[in-house]
C-alpha cells in the first residue's frame, strides 16, 4: 500500500485521536498533542459526513472541556485549523479557543 504524505498525516491523526479517545473514556486527562488530534479527527469526520464549515467551527468548541485536559493545555491551544475534505472540495476549518469551561 502506498500512501501520499497527506494520507500518512491523516492516518497518524486518526491513530493519535483513537488513543486520545480511549484515554478520555477512561478519565485520563489529555495532553496537548492528544487534544489537538482528538479535535482534528472529529472535524475531519464531520466534513466527510457533509457538515458545513460553520457547523464544524461551532462543534469544535464542544468536544473538550478544561476537565478533559491537563492543566495549561487550554491556554496552549488558541486555535485549531484543519484542512478538511468536504463533498464539494477542500476547505479550511478554524476553531478558535476550542477548549472551554463546562457550563453550569
Curated annotation (Swiss-Prot):
Reactions catalysed, semicolon-separated, are: urea + 2 H2O + H(+) = hydrogencarbonate + 2 NH4(+)
Per the record, the domain of life is: Bacteria
Which terms in the Gene Ontology molecular function aspect does this entry carry? nickel cation binding; urease activity
GO CC annotations, alphabetized? cytoplasm
Tell me where it mainly resides.
Answer: cytoplasm
Enzyme class (EC, first level): hydrolase
Compartmental location: Cytoplasm
Q: Which keywords does the record carry?
A: Cytoplasm, Hydrolase
Q: In which pathway does it act?
A: Nitrogen metabolism; urea degradation; CO(2) and NH(3) from urea (urease route): step 1/1
What is this enzyme's EC? 3.5.1.5
- UniProt-listed GO biological process terms: urea catabolic process
What is an example of a Pfam family matching this protein? Urease_gamma
Output the InterPro entries linked to this UniProt entry. Answer: Urease_gamma, Urease_gamma/gamma-beta_su, Urease_gamma_sf, Urease_subunit
Instruction: Identify the NCBIfam families for this entry.
Output: PRK13241.1, urease_gam
What is annotated about its quaternary structure and interactions?
Heterotrimer of UreA (gamma), UreB (beta) and UreC (alpha) subunits. Three heterotrimers associate to form the active enzyme.
Q: Which family does it belong to?
A: Belongs to the urease gamma subunit family.
Please report the name of this protein according to its UniProt entry: Urease subunit gamma
* Organism field: Actinomyces naeslundii
Amino acid at each position: 500500500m502506498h500512501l501520499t504524505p497527506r494520507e500518512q498525516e491523516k492516518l497518524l491523526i486518526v491513530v493519535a485521536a483513537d488513543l486520545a479517545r480511549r484515554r478520555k473514556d477512561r478519565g485520563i486527562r489529555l495532553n496537548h498533542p492528544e487534544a489537538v488530534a482528538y479535535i482534528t479527527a472529529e472535524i475531519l469526520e464531520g466534513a466527510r459526513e457533509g457538515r458545513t464549515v460553520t457547523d464544524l467551527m461551532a462543534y469544535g468548541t464542544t468536544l473538550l472541556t478544561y476537565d478533559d485536559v491537563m492543566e495549561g493545555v487550554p491556554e496552549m491551544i488558541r486555535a485549531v485549523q484543519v484542512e478538511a475534505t468536504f463533498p464539494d472540495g477542500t476547505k479550511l476549518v478554524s476553531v478558535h479557543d476550542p477548549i472551554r469551561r463546562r457550563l453550569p
